[in-house]
Amino acid sequence: GANDFMRF
């Protein structure tokens, strides 16, 4: 989603 960059 829009916050996939938060998936570590």
Swiss-Prot record:
GO terms for biological process: neuropeptide signaling pathway. The modification Phenylalanine amide is found at F8. It comes from the Eukaryota. Keywords: Amidation, Neuropeptide, Secreted. It is found in: Secreted. GO terms for cellular component: extracellular region. Belongs to the FARP (FMRFamide related peptide) family. This is CalliFMRFamide-8. The lineage of its organism: Eukaryota, Metazoa, Ecdysozoa, Arthropoda, Hexapoda.
